[in-house]
């Protein structure tokens, strides 16, 4: 696949090579070394959901993105193949390879997450944030959520956290009383002969 003497490459797959100056390459190598610990923490939390976590240079606005392996299916192809009625399940499981998470080390969310993870790797909030980032990057990268209910629970938990609502607080909602049951003797229904 060539165009005008240049090789075309899918930007949603791993191995996208963006040509930069020597100084930019050195800066990127420094960032990779600095964020290696966070990449390991994210990989440990996501475990089998991602093949690896790397510092990427393809994104500028998002905190992270999910890409597929060089020979795996893209997000759109994955969606098409899942919709096939007569699909080959053995081929599907093979081609649905694990995703690769690329983090944007220059994004403020990733920087703050790194500080929080460096302070305490076992913090529950760090784990929730990592899962939330994974789920949102699934959506922004074009993949389907595997567990939408779990995703919405994570969102609700973060909203509670943002609104300073205590997680342990008992959330008894006042429900209207149930309709009273009527005895058979007090029934006002017509009797049938």
Swiss-Prot record:
GO MF terms held by the record: ATP binding; ATP hydrolysis activity; ATP-dependent protein folding chaperone; unfolded protein binding
Placement of sequence motif TPR repeat-binding: 189-193
Any coiled-coil regions, as ranges: none
Domain of life: Eukaryota
InterPro entries in the record: HSP90_C, Hsp90_fam
Region Disordered, residue ranges: 171-193
Keyword ATP-binding in annotation: yes
Record keywords, A-Z: ATP-binding, Chaperone, Cytoplasm, Nucleotide-binding, Stress response
Main location class: cytoplasm
Gene Ontology CC, one term: cytoplasm
Summary of subunit composition and partner proteins: Homodimer.
Family: Belongs to the heat shock protein 90 family.
Comment on protein domains: The TPR repeat-binding motif mediates interaction with TPR repeat-containing proteins.
Protein name from the UniProt record: Heat shock 90 kDa protein homolog
Organism of derivation: Plasmodium falciparum (isolate Palo Alto / Uganda)
């Amino acid at each position: 696949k060539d165009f005008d003497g240049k090789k075309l490459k899918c930007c949603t797959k791993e191995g996208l090579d963006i040509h930069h100056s020597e100084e930019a390459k050195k800066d990127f190598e420094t960032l990779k070394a600095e964020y290696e610990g966070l990449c390991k923490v994210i990989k440990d939390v996501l475990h089998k959901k991602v093949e690896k976590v790397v510092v990427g240079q393809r994104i500028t606005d998002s905190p992270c993105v999910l890409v597929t392996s060089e020979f795996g299916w893209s997000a759109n192809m994955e969606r098409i193949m899942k919709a096939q009625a007569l699909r080959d399940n053995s081929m599907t499981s093979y081609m649905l390879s694990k995703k690769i998470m690329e983090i944007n080390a220059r994004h403020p969310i990733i920087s703050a997450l790194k500080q929080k993870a460096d302070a305490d790797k076992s913090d529950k909030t760090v784990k929730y944030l990592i899962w939330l980032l994974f789920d949102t990057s699934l959506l922004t990268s074009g993949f389907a959520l595997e567990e939408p209910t779990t995703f919405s629970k994570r969102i609700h938990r973060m909203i509670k956290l943002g609104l300073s609502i205590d997680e342990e607080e008992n959330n008894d909602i006042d429900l209207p009383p149930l309709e009273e049951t009527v005895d058979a003797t007090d029934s006002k229904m017509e009797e049938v002969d």
